[in-house]
């Protein structure tokens, strides 16, 4: 798991390889990731938007921006947490994701919180001995 804390808000990411959705012979590798956001600050905040930078093993960079996460803009009171899952396809067997969320505080001011960088790697293949 990967974790970052900004202004008392903790973002934890747990990536996992989706072997059944991947087709390595077609250069299609798919990962899922579970994100948990915990508001350990003293104010209510709302997640407004997201930004991801996805880099594959060849150095190709894809940027993704959008409103909220999985169609929602959750409000987190102090002590609340929010969890969601999403996915990412790549044409290489490894890559890196990093990003940030745009948040809004009680006073309406917006600020960014860090999504920690995390690696997407195909688990080592098990060797079968005959």
From Swiss-Prot:
Residues of the ApaG domain: 3-127
Domain of life, source organism: Bacteria
InterPro entries named in the record: ApaG_domain (IPR007474), ApaG_sf (IPR036767), Uncharacterised_ApaG (IPR023065)
One BP annotation, GO: error-free translesion synthesis
Entry protein name: Protein ApaG
